[in-house]
């Protein structure tokens, strides 16, 4: 119903590495920011990959090309803790992926917006029961997991939900 996919925005923001926590006794931060223990990538390897997989899964399109800007924001850190990637998908769709572990105040903010020629959708992990659909020719719709919708598309979404309303 969205039509041919044109644009995908996906983001995964956390704030738990806003400070140099790896040097303050945080064992989780210590191994995740040490390239000898966690590998060559920090933020993008840790959470950016989840955002990329979500974009491919939701859109049904595979990423074909990317151009990344990775940053180490917190002085003294050995790996990237923030970054942005321009994406090119199959069927000439484009996208932007941002991932950050220095977004102070954020817990686990994974969010996606997908736009096609007829409309778009938005979903956020912090509101997992809600899917917002926006159309070029009618008002936006908000679907909730476990609700009993009668139209074909909404009932398809509801029938594919494994949990009752109000459960993540």
Annotate each PLM feature.
Residues 1-77, 131:
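Predominantly a Rossmann-like dinucleotide-binding segment in NAD(P)-dependent oxidoreductases
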Residues 50, 78-83, 89:
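Substrate-positioning beta->alpha
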Residues 10-16, 70-74, 91-93, 101-103, ...:
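Glycine-rich beta-alpha junction loops
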Residues 24, 28, 32, 57, ...:
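C-terminal glycine/acidic-rich active-site capping loop/insertion
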């Amino acid at each position: 119903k969205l039509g041919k996919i044109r644009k995908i925005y996906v983001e995964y923001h956390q704030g738990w590495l806003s400070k140099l926590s790896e040097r303050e006794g945080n064992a989780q931060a210590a191994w995740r920011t040490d390239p000898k223990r966690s590998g060559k990538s920090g933020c993008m390897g840790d959470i950016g990959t989840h955002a990329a997989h979500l974009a491919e899964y939701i859109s049904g399109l595979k990423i074909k090309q990317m151009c990344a800007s990775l940053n180490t924001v917190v002085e003294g850190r050995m790996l990237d803790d923030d970054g942005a990637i321009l994406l090119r998908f199959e069927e000439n769709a484009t996208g932007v992926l941002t991932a950050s572990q220095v977004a102070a105040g954020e817990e686990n903010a994974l969010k996606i917006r997908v736009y096609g020629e007829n409309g778009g959708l938005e979903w956020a992990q912090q509101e997992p029961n809600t899917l917002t659909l926006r159309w070029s020719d009618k008002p936006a719709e908000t679907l909730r997991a476990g609700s009993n919708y009668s139209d074909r598309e909404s009932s398809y979404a509801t029938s594919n939900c494994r949990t009752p309303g109000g459960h993540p």
